């Protein structure tokens, strides 16, 4: 509990002043995420719900979004204690529901109270959300919610709906 409140105190301090970000060409190796391999993996899957064009667009959009997040300066690369803690909670949740999907949490430098998940197991947790969380149980609830989005392929479902709607 002390670690949790100390972490939240640091998170609140992290959001107290505006940040100015610049593109980061020097992403630490542990964060390297090969967007090309993600794109190939996603386009190689045969999905009866998606036409080949929509599937390629979907794969490209996921890969592009993550690449943009990594290079934007919005991802914390130097806060390993908090990242390890949140990833350990995600691992416990995934193990408890017997999920075979691998998850990775990225901490986002933003005051927004938000979190999001991609179907490929990437979860973005915004520091503004962590600053508002009252205890570990609340954080676990948010993480479980995001894991459910990834498991149920909600990103893909939204992309399909958007693709169909934009054709009208």
Q: Where do the PLM segments sit?
A:
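Peri-catalytic and regulatory segments of divalent metal-dependent proteins
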Residues: 18-168
């Amino acid at each position: 509990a002390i670690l949790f409140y100390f972490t939240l105190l640091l998170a609140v301090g992290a959001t107290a002043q505006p940040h100015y970000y610049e593109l980061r060409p020097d992403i630490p190796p542990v964060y390297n995420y090969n967007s090309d391999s993600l794109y190939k993996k996603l386009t190689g899957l045969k999905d009866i719900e998606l036409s080949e064009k929509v599937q390629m667009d979907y794969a490209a959009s996921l890969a592009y979004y993550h690449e943009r997040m990594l290079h934007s300066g919005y991802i914390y690369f130097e806060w390993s204690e908090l990242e390890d803690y949140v990833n350990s909670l995600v691992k416990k949740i995934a193990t408890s529901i017997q999920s075979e999907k691998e998850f990775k949490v990225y901490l986002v430098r933003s005051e927004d109270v938000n979190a999001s998940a991609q179907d490929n197991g990437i979860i973005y947790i915004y520091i503004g959300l962590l600053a508002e969380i009252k205890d570990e149980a609340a954080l676990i609830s948010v993480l479980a919610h995001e894991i459910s989005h990834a498991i149920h392929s909600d990103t893909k479902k939204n992309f399909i709906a958007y693709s169909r709607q934009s054709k009208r």
